[in-house]
Structures are given as C-alpha cells and as structure tokens.
C-alpha cells in the first residue's frame, strides 16, 4: 500500500479495496521501521491517527464520500496542531503544545484526512538543507549522505521514501519547491493569499505560503483543493474563488506559450541540470507548447533583496519568543534583560540568530533606507518584470535549483553558498506568484527538478502542464533504493 499515490488511495478507499484503518496501520509500521534512517518526523501521532482513521471509515460507511476522506497526511511542524507539540524545529518551542489547529490543518481534518505526525524542518523554516533543526539533520532517501533540501526537508524525505503519499509544506523562498526537486517530488507553492497562513508560525509574513508536496501533479491538485480558500482569520488571505484543480489536468497544451528566461542559464548553474531543463522543454514542445526566450533583468538582485526582507520580517516575528509568554525560558534569570538574553541565546540556533541580527541591522535607523527600502524597491521591479513577461508568455520554465543535493555538512560553514541555492525559487516569493517543481531526471543518481511559474491564481495551469508532462515521462515514478 505504501507505493500508492494519493489519487490511487482515494480510489482504493472509495471502492473498499482497503480501509483507512488498515492503510494507517501499515504506514505507521513503515514509519517506525524506516524513519530512524531519515529523521523525517519530529512527532508521530500514532494513537490519534488510528482514532482519526476509524472515524473516517465510519463516515464512509455512513455514506459520506470525498477524495481526501481517510487518506493520510503529515504536517510540517510549523502548522499548529491542537494538543500536539508544534516545535518549528527549534529548542525555543520544544515544549510548546498548540491550543488550536491552523486553518490548513482544520480544513484537511474536516475533509477526513488522517494526521500521522509532524515533519522535521529547518529551525523556524530558515534553511535550504534541513540541517538547522534542533532535532537533527534530515537525510535524503536517494543518498543518506546528502541533504533533502529545506526548509520542508522532513515533509519531502517522508514522501520520497514512501512513508506516506503527501505532506504539507511551506514556501518562503523555495522551501517546498527546492526539497521537491532534490527528492524527486512534485511541490507547489500557491499564489500568496491562496492558502491561509492562520496558525502557521511565521518566518517572513509577506513571503510565507503553505502548499502541498506529493509524488504527482494529480496528488498536488487533490491536496491543494483541501488546503485552499479564503479565511477571514488571515488578513492576507485573498477572497478568490477556488476552482476544481483536478478538472483541467488533461487539458491540451496546444499553443501554450512558454518563456525561457536567458538569465536562468548564467554562471552557477550545473550544465547537467541545464540539459535536463532543455530536455523537459522538448517534451512540452512535443505536446504542442511554443517556447520563446524572455528576459527577467532584475533577477540578478533577487538574492540580495530577499536576504534583507526575509530576515527583517523574521527579526520582528521572532521578537515574541522571549521566555515570558511562551517558548524556552532560561534557568534562574538575574533580571529581565538576563531573561531575554539567555532565553533567546539558548532557545535559538546559530542560523536563526544570524538572520535575526541581519534583520535587526537592516531595520535600524541608520540603515533602513539604505537596505530595507532599497530591497522593497527591487522587489517591485522584480514583480514588474514578471508582469511584463506574462504579457508575452503563459508560463515560465527553468531549473528549480542550480545544483543537485549536496553532502550533509558541505555548506555548513558557508551560509552564502547555501543562500545561493535559492537563486531560482525566491523570485516567485518576492512577486507572490504560484510556482511548481516537477521531477525532471537525475544527475549522478540524485534527482533534479524543473520549475514552472504562472500568473497569479493560475495554479491550475501549472498542475495541468506538470500532469501532461508526467503522462509522457516516468521520472516521478522512480523510487529510491531501499524504500
């Protein structure tokens, strides 16, 4: 059963080939057996999962239907889950039990999904390798010496290892798409505001967006259907009708205009990944798409702008973790200043402290105009570049990452080298656009992905293209040895 996709599970539950309780039991056994090699879960909610599975079976027996009813899910450990530890991968929240469910968690529970647990992640979602977690690094199932990407590395590794068919993730600068590329999955970052952020512990509020990680575009469509929708509790949620994301998966690509930005193929891109992108473009051309070269002239400034804006917002968001209201509290503080200093110094890891300091510096009186305001101006220019490009093309294609997965620890002493791995993904966050990564082949036995970007609220188009591509390629069906 562990080889089944989410769509196959939906069909199997509907025709009573197996029950949700049987499926849940089998996957929990698999997690217990294999996850010690991967470290993809922080918390496994075995008792709760079996209870939810029995409840889903009862709902189905009573005549209820639904594609997600009784299907398994695990949540990235920054989505609040009532009564279950929500750690954000940090010592700071090691003992935090959420008093309510995040909107995404509540919506999927209402649809009848069974939560198997909470997945490992970079601390407070800050990282591209899942090495900064308080609970230890996550291993890539394709090669246990390599990183799975981040910050949703646990979510990606769990699905890639067939521990379950799909997980939730979040994407602030590529944290769904990059691990999807490095573990041979399909990962979708929706348009900013498409999925509620309520109950999702914030990293950078103007960039964060929740989305699905799964093996196929068809599965991502099913999961996004359950996650998306307006939420009055989230002031950044957009009141936009949610289409049936599965309805147009098989639509023709005849005449589809695809843009290939020349800036994507400069220095820093592994030439073997460039070859995989070109091969994917040829497949889409065979399906009727028309490809033309375009330009995104301000992309070269994206990393600099992102690594000012995101840390600035993080320094503000993380100021609430001070050892007073909640979070780690140091022992025997001498006074309030000592409480703040030691609680935060002990509770936050090195990478989080680094970004808080960068963000605080960028927002300080003497440097606000020089850094933060400039970064926001560049952000606007990047958005304008996309608006102009989408006048000429329907979607944009390119590499998801400049390199395949690297060895654990290889970039640990060089944060800039790790930041540069976000080169192709962060522009979608700065502009608020939807983006999808899909499996596109292998380099040295490690998976690589191709990224698609579309205009606002056109997730359906991305899913359609990825699904049609997956009908004529088999990259997404390949599984790592031993899993």
UniProtKB/Swiss-Prot annotation:
InterPro entries: Amidase (IPR000120), Amidase_CS (IPR020556), Amidase_dom (IPR023631), AS_sf (IPR036928), GatA (IPR004412). GO terms for molecular function: ATP binding; glutaminyl-tRNA synthase (glutamine-hydrolyzing) activity. It comes from the Bacteria. Keywords: ATP-binding, Ligase, Nucleotide-binding, Protein biosynthesis. It catalyses: L-glutamyl-tRNA(Gln) + L-glutamine + ATP + H2O = L-glutaminyl-tRNA(Gln) + L-glutamate + ADP + phosphate + H(+). GO terms for biological process: translation. The active site is at 76 (charge relay system), 151 (charge relay system), 175 (acyl-ester intermediate). SUPFAM superfamilies: Amidase signature (AS) enzymes. PANTHER family: GLUTAMYL-TRNA(GLN) AMIDOTRANSFERASE SUBUNIT A (PTHR11895:SF151), TRANSAMIDASE (PTHR11895). NCBIfam families: gatA (TIGR00132). This is Glutamyl-tRNA(Gln) amidotransferase subunit A. It comes from Pseudomonas entomophila (strain L48).
